[in-house]
Amino acid sequence: MTALENKCAIKMENITKRFGSVVANNAINMELREGEILSLLGENGSGKTTLMNMLSGIYFPDEGQIYIHDKPVTIASPKDAFDLGIGMIHQHFKLVDLFTATENIILGLEGKLDLNNARKKVKDICDRYGFDIDPDMKIYDMSVSQKQTLEIVKVLYRGADILILDEPTAVLTPQETDKLFAVMRNMKADGKSLIIITHKLHEVLDVSDRVAVLRKGEYIGDVMTKDANQQSLTDMMVGHSVTLNINRPEPINVTPRLKLDGLTVFDELGVKRLDNVSFTINAGEVLGVAGVAGSGQRELLE
C-alpha cells in the first residue's frame, strides 16, 4: 500500500495559534499519511516549528482539532504526545553529557528499569533501522551526528510511530545527511510516518514523498515531490516567481585587499583547527565562508 492510499496518521483541522496579537498559525488544515515522509517547507517565521510544537505538546492550539489515526485527541503536554506515539527531535538536543546513551534513553521513564534489558533494546533498534550508536558511550564522547541519532533512537524506544524532525541536517555533513536519509527510509519501510522541517530544497526532493508549504502562518498547499522542483517549491514559499540563478556583475576593481596563504592554526590544546587555508579577497567582493559547526570558521575570523 502506498502513502497515497494510506489512512491519516495525523489530521489537523483549522489549527490556530496566537501569541498576543501575533497569529503564528491561522486555520491550518494539514495531513500526514501513514508510512509517508512529509517535508514541511516555509520561510523563517512562517509558523512551521510552532505548528509542530502543538503536535509535540509544547504549545496548545487556541482553535481547531487534532486527529491521530482518525481519532480526535487532546495534546496538552509532551507526555500526551508520547502516549499517542508522537516523538519530536528538536534542533537543540536534550541529553545529559555525563550519562551513557542507554541511560539518557531511559531517563524519566516510570517503573522498574533494567539497564541490561534497556541496552539490548537500544541495540535491537539500532540494528533494525541502521543506526550506529554504542549503547554504553558517554554523551560527551559523541559527535553532533551521534547525538542527533540518539535523540531519534530515544523516541523510537518510547514507542513513537510518528516522528517530527526539526531542521535535522543543519549540523550534519553531506555524508551524515545521506546516512540520516537512509535511516529515515528504513523507518518509512517499517510503517513509521515522518515529518521533516527543512529549508534545503534539494534535500526535500531527495527524501520526501510529499511537500506541504506554510507562508506567513497560512497553509498554502501541498504537492507530490515527484511533481515538484526547486523553482516551483520556492515560488510556493514566497508567493511569487523567484529567480534562483543570480548573475552578479564582475567587480571593476580587482585589487586584492586580503590574502591568506597556507594559514594553519592550533588551539590551546594543540589541536589543529585550520590546515593550510589559502584565499584572496578582492576590492568590491563579498566572500562567503561556509561549513558545519566546528569546521574552523570561528578560528578563521579570530
Regions found by a protein language model. Name each.
Residues T2-E302:
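Glycine-rich phosphate-binding loops of nucleotide-dependent enzymes
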